[in-house]
Amino acid sequence: MIMNTFEDLFSEYAGRITDTVNEQESVFIQYCKLFSSIITDSFYVLDIVQKQFCYIKPDNLFLCDHSVEEAMRLGHDFYTQIIHPDDLPLWTNILKIIPQYLDRKDKWNEIDYFSCTLRLLRKYSFSSHFLSQMVYQRMKPICLNNNLRYLICIVEN
């Protein structure tokens, strides 16, 4: 029920987001903050077209000791900082396959979400090396004007 309401609100405001001072984005970001406060998992929204994050819950599971500001600044390149190098090709392929799959409009009703399991790189104070942490990620596609525009992502361990 919450996801349907979220998707409705997201679709309504996401198509009108143009810059960070935009009133619609402000409402959308406030809704993301509210939604992320009631879930225990990491949560973020990725703009597929601009390869930037729209929102990132300030949660260390996804951020891996990086700041929200750093992730927002790096955008799509942030994944190279946190995903294990052996899993990065998998993630890159997933981001290519989702739009290709959704290009087939007849498949839209078959898809609730996409998912994958991959390793994130963690830096711990007791180790001089990065350690891997396996996480499960769900990605809900949001289409605007019949084109994939956003992925609503939940990361859990």
Regions found by a protein language model. Give the residues of each.
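PAS-family sensory modules
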Residues: 1-42, 133-157
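Conserved beta-strand and immediately adjacent loop positions that scaffold enzyme active sites
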Residues: 42, 52, 117-118, 133
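Acidic/polar residues at beta-strand termini and the immediately following turn/coil
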Residues: 46-47, 121-123, 157
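Short acidic, gly/pro-rich beta-turn/loop elements at beta-sheet edges
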Residues: 53, 128, 140-144
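PAS-family sensory domains
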Residues: 67-130
